[in-house]
Amino acid sequence: ANKPYHGKSKAGYYGDFVIETDAMVGKVMNALNMHGFADNTLVVFTADNGAETHAFERLEEFKQWSSGKYRGVKRDVYEGGHRVPFIVKWPGKIKQGSVSDEVVSQVDFAATFAKIINYPLGKKEAIDSYNLLPVFEGKKYSKPLRVATVQNTSPKKFALRQGDWVLIDLSLIHI
C-alpha cells in the first residue's frame, strides 16, 4: 500500500492494500460517472493469482484469509493459488447481483472483447479463448463452457480441472 494508506486498516499491509484498492476503484467509477461513461462501460475487476506464501502470517496475526476456504497459494496448482474474484459491471448488459458457476479463465477476455467490438478472430488468434458474453447474459449451458481447464504456474506443476474434479500430480481430488 502507498504511504497515505499505511495503518488505515489495522490489519497490516494487506488490509491497507485492500483499502487503497477500494479507494482507487472508487475513483475510477466516480470518473466514469462524472464524464457520463458509466452506463456504457464494461468494468472488470479481477486478480492474477491467489494469496502469496506470506499470507499464512497474515492469517495467524489478523485472522484473515484472502483465499477463503481454498487450499493453496500463488504459483500453486491448488484452487487457492488461482481461483480469484471475477467481478464484471456492464449496465444494461449484465444483471446486477448475478452470479455464475461457469468456470472461466482470463484468457477468455480475448474472445469476449473481440466479440464486443465485432473483431473477427483469425484461426491462430486466441485459440483457447471463449466468448463470455452468454455467461454475462446469465445463460445456462447444457454442458460446461469448456471441457477442462489446465492450470500450471511452474514448468513441473500442472493441474487439470473438469467440473468439480481436479487432477493434481496424478492424484484426483473432489473440490
Annotate each predicted stretch with a short phrase.
Residues 16, 22, 39, 48, ...:
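Acidic side chains
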Residues 4-13, 30-93:
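Histidine-centered active-site microenvironments of extracellular/periplasmic hydrolases
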Residues 51-77, 93-98, 102, 107-173:
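C-terminal cap/loop subdomain of S1 sulfatases and analogous C-terminal strand-loop tails that border
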Residues 13-19, 103:
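Catalytic nucleophile-loop/oxyanion-hole region of alpha/beta-hydrolase
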Residues 1, 18, 25, 42-47, ...:
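Beta-strand elements within well-structured catalytic alpha/beta cores of enzymes
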Residues 28, 174-175:
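Aromatic/hydrophobic pocket-lining residues that form π-stacking "cages" and hydrophobic walls in ligand
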Residues 23-30:
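Core alpha-helical elements of the protein kinase catalytic domain
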